[in-house]
Amino acid sequence: MTAPLTLLIVEDETPLAEMHAEYIRHIPGFSQILLAGNLAQARMMIERFKPGLILLDNYLPDGRGINLLHELVQAHYPGDVVFTTAASDMETVSEAVRCGVFDYLIKPIAYERLGQTLTRFRQRKHMLESIDSASQKQIDEMFNAYARGEPKDELPTGIDPLTLNAVRKLFKEPGVQHTAETVAQALTISRTTARRYLEYCASRHLIIAEIVHGKVGRPQRIYHSG
């Protein structure tokens, strides 16, 4: 069995980093979740805790995450990096890919998509640690993890077609906006269930997810029709 991992979130917006951490805590396989708000803190935590996976934002108060990524590559750091950034320009994407990032997620991140990334990461790590020599099929599975998707006619575990259809109907009209709480109230389901369906819809580009910062309190995740 693969040993639990330490995961480091490098994100300067503390409430957003805490939202990511809260989601990841419900995913098995990560024993410790650390938060760093800038590159200096990230370097210190990497040196001290040796996280197996780093969720790295690109634009930080004291520099760019891509520069830290280059440092890790030059140091032959054994952990993996997932870029979590609003930078969708192809130059940054290409640079990150050349550095060997495990995945590249554009903000606002759909948590269903983040969950898929973390699941693939754990599966690949388990395969690398559990076998001494690999067959071509196993190598193909490792390298084709990004290309494989769920069959179009199949839904992932925990997504019921009737409930999914009910959620999608709430967004029929242009400009409709909901939160997990309003969907939960409308369909008489729990907020956790509502959030799961909303994140699934966002990951399939059926709706759009955004983070809205209020004057006080934590940022709120809003979902709306395109």
UniProtKB/Swiss-Prot annotation:
Gene3D superfamilies: 3.40.50.2300. Residues 180-199 bind DNA. The keyword Chloroplast does not apply. It is found in: Cytoplasm. Keywords: Activator, Cytoplasm, DNA-binding, Phosphoprotein, Transcription, Transcription regulation, Two-component regulatory system. Residues 6-122 form the Response regulatory domain. Phosphorylated and activated by DpiB. The modification 4-aspartylphosphate is found at D57. NCBIfam families: PRK10046.1. Member of the two-component regulatory system DpiA/DpiB, which is essential for expression of citrate-specific fermentation genes and genes involved in plasmid inheritance. Could be involved in response to both the presence of citrate and external redox conditions. Regulates the transcription of citCDEFXGT, dpiAB, mdh and exuT. Binds specifically to the dpiB-citC intergenic region. This is Transcriptional regulatory protein DpiA. It comes from Escherichia coli (strain K12). The lineage of its organism: Bacteria, Pseudomonadati, Pseudomonadota, Gammaproteobacteria, Enterobacterales. The gene is dpiA.
